[in-house]
């Protein structure tokens, strides 16, 4: 039976890899909705190839360019919607059974909530939705009775390992991290690294923001918070280990101390496919893992001096309330400034820490959506206000 899906962030890394899955499995999936930011050329190609029923382009001023780019499709005309509201329309579009949330950052929160409220199952590739919005997202998931399935490699690995583990059987989660672009760089050299240096990920092909998050290890810190919300373990039972080969995507320890792991080549398509096909397993012709070719697998403790963002994430997670939303927004804004070469690499954790410290007195244990969104905006403003004052010298 063909599953009808919509993709939020179709021109990004997650979106294009999801569409690659659809291309190889047309008997399993049909695209009914696409939402993208402003990449007209790529979105036009996707519209022509997959012929969705509804298409959103967030940058409304580019709608006419998009229509012109697909003008030769005289036998087909989708419904066009624009702006943030248009993305929400795609998220809740009636004919889709599942929605892949590939929008980067907290911008994915409201569309994901709209999809959940419309009764759609979620293939969650946007971790910020849970990190910032868990206090409102999780009750909505329970109310609507939808499935919230992890589509990133680490949480998919945990989810796969948990199949068959009885309730209460999970003892510890071990998240693996590649270590990012600077895993082998002496910490003394970090003040001198450039944007180009930070974007050279050793293992994965990802978007710019998540690649920087990998270099700071904030990506793993955010995944700790996401794992807490998805799987219900407290932070003392969620660990991070550096695994340079990125073959083991994460592990779980069960009550008898047995450890289960999910292995595979670094390929985001596998967790995406599993989130869309669960509980089934769909045959693929992708290159299977060859353990001899993979060679030795190594592990080491993260360097806390090199990766201060990791502990900032643990601290925000333990604080709870709207603090994870503040952490996430501060990180998004700081990373954006770094990518614009307005701050140094080491200014990223400095700005995040200062912002979180300033929010402590405002935090509330059970924030509503309005409070979460206000905290997000406050954190972004605070980072911008303090960015001119950070110590950028080596």
From Swiss-Prot:
Source organism, top-level taxon: Bacteria
Pfam families: DXP_redisom_C (PF08436), DXP_reductoisom (PF02670), DXPR_C (PF13288)
Keywords linked to the UniProt accession: Isoprene biosynthesis, Manganese, Metal-binding, NADP, Oxidoreductase
Residues engaged in binding NADPH: 11-14, 37, 39, 126, 128, 207
UniProt binding sites for Mn(2+): 152, 154, 223
Matches recorded under SUPFAM superfamilies: 1-deoxy-D-xylulose-5-phosphate reductoisomerase, C-terminal domain, Glyceraldehyde-3-phosphate dehydrogenase-like, C-terminal domain, NAD(P)-binding Rossmann-fold domains
EC category: oxidoreductase
InterPro entries in the cross-refs: DXP_reductoisomerase, DXP_reductoisomerase_C, DXP_reductoisomerase_N, DXPR_C, DXPR_C_sf, NAD(P)-bd_dom_sf
GO MF entries: 1-deoxy-D-xylulose-5-phosphate reductoisomerase activity; manganese ion binding; NADPH binding
Gene3D superfamilies attached to this UniProt entry: 1.10.1740.10, NAD(P)-binding Rossmann-like Domain
Enzyme Commission number(s) of this protein: 1.1.1.267
Protein name: 1-deoxy-D-xylulose 5-phosphate reductoisomerase
Organism: Synechocystis sp. (strain ATCC 27184 / PCC 6803 / Kazusa)
């Amino acid at each position: 039976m063909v599953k009808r899906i919509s993709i939020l962030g179709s021109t990004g890394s997650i979106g294009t890899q999801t569409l690659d899955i659809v291309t190889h499995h047309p008997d399993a999936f049909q695209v009914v909705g696409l939402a993208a930011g402003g990449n007209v050329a790529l979105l036009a190609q996707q519209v022509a190839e997959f012929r969705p029923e509804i298409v959103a382009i967030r940058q409304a001023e580019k709608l006419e360019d998009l229509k012109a780019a697909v003008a030769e499709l005289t036998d087909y005309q989708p419904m066009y919607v624009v702006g943030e509201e248009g993305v929400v329309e795609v998220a809740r579009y009636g004919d889709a059974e599942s929605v892949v949330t590939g929008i980067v950052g907290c911008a994915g929160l409201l569309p994901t909530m709209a999809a959940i409220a419309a009764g759609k199952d979620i293939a969650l590739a946007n971790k910020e939705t849970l990190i910032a919005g868990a206090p409102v997202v999780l009750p909505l998931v329970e109310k609507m009775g939808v499935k919230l399935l992890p589509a990133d490699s680490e949480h998919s690995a945990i989810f796969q390992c948990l199949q068959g583990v009885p309730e209460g059987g999970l003892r510890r989660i071990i998240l693996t991290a590649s270590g990012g672009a600077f895993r082998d760089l002496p910490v003394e050299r970090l003040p001198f690294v450039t944007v180009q240096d930070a974007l050279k990920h050793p293992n994965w092909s990802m978007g710019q923001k998540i690649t920087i998050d990998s270099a700071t290890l904030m990506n793993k810190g955010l995944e700790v918070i996401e794992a807490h919300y998805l799987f219900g373990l407290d932070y003392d039972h969620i660990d991070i280990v550096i695994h340079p080969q990125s073959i083991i995507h994460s592990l779980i320890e069960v009550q008898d101390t047995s450890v289960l792991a999910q292995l595979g080549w670094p390929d985001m398509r596998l967790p995406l496919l599993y989130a869309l096909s669960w509980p089934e397993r769909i045959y693929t012709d992708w290159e299977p893992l060859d353990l001899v070719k993979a060679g030795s697998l190594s592990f080491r403790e993260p360097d806390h001096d090199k990766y201060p963002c990791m502990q900032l994430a643990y601290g925000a997670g333990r604080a709870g309330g709207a603090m994870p939303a503040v952490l996430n927004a501060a990180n998004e804004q700081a990373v954006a400034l770094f990518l614009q070469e307005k701050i140094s690499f080491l200014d990223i954790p400095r700005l995040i820490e200062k912002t979180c410290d300033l929010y402590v007195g405002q935090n509330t244990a059970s924030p509503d959506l309005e409070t979460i969104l206000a905290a997000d905006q406050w954190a972004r403003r605070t980072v911008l206000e303090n960015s001119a004052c950070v110590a950028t010298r080596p």
